Amino acid sequence: MGKAQSVRFKVSKLMAYILRHDPWSFNLQPDEEGFVDLEEFVNAIRRVYPWVTKEFILDIVERDEKERYEVKEGKIRARYGHSYPVILDHKEDKESKTLYHGTIRENLEGIMREGIKPMKRQFVHLSLNYEDAYNTGRRHGSNVVVLMIDADCLRKKGFKILKAGKKVRIVKYVPVDCIVGEL
């Protein structure tokens, strides 16, 4: 990772932290959908990175492969990953058949007993492919296991699968019997 990429990565991490977990520490007041004023958000980021511009933030939003952020009507929010309650208006995924969840092996026993819970978040994050799920699991440790999730099973049990990004799906909970394999 080059220096420019490293700086972009660090700013993006701060953006995600603020928008997903603690806007109040930066004097931001999210609305019920998690949006904050974009200009105020840029000023909040400048408290840590004084050189940041609105254009730099918008470029991060535009280039983000996981589509973590959304800008609308002069406001910005995280599209998923919140640890505080937000109302999300994402479209429902009615097409996916198999989804994937990356975790570490140490979590497997509890998951196979209780299902996949959102833990400190509002939703469980699922991926459309093995590689993305594996990379998500790697953030938590090196002994990664990827679980295969039957999306139709989730739907039959009344769980809505939401499209949080092109390759990211979110759901309130994954029951044990909807986990159909381990890779």
Swiss-Prot record:
SUPFAM superfamilies: ADP-ribosylation
Gene Ontology terms: biological process: tRNA splicing, via endonucleolytic cleavage and ligation
Pfam family, one: PTS_2-RNA
Classification via Gene3D superfamilies: 3.20.170.30, RNA 2'-phosphotransferase, Tpt1/KptA family, N-terminal domain (1.10.10.970)
Keyword line: NAD, Transferase
Class of the enzyme per the UniProt entry, highest EC level: transferase
Signal peptide: none
GO molecular function: NAD+ poly-ADP-ribosyltransferase activity; tRNA 2'-phosphotransferase activity
EC assignment: 2.7.1.-
UniProt record similarity statement: Belongs to the KptA/TPT1 family.
Job description of the protein: Removes the 2'-phosphate from RNA via an intermediate in which the phosphate is ADP-ribosylated by NAD followed by a presumed transesterification to release the RNA and generate ADP-ribose 1''-2''-cyclic phosphate (APPR>P). May function as an ADP-ribosylase.
PANTHER family: PUTATIVE PHOSPHOTRANSFERASE, TRNA 2'-PHOSPHOTRANSFERASE 1
Annotated protein name in UniProt: Probable RNA 2'-phosphotransferase
Organism field: Pyrococcus abyssi (strain GE5 / Orsay)
Gene: kptA
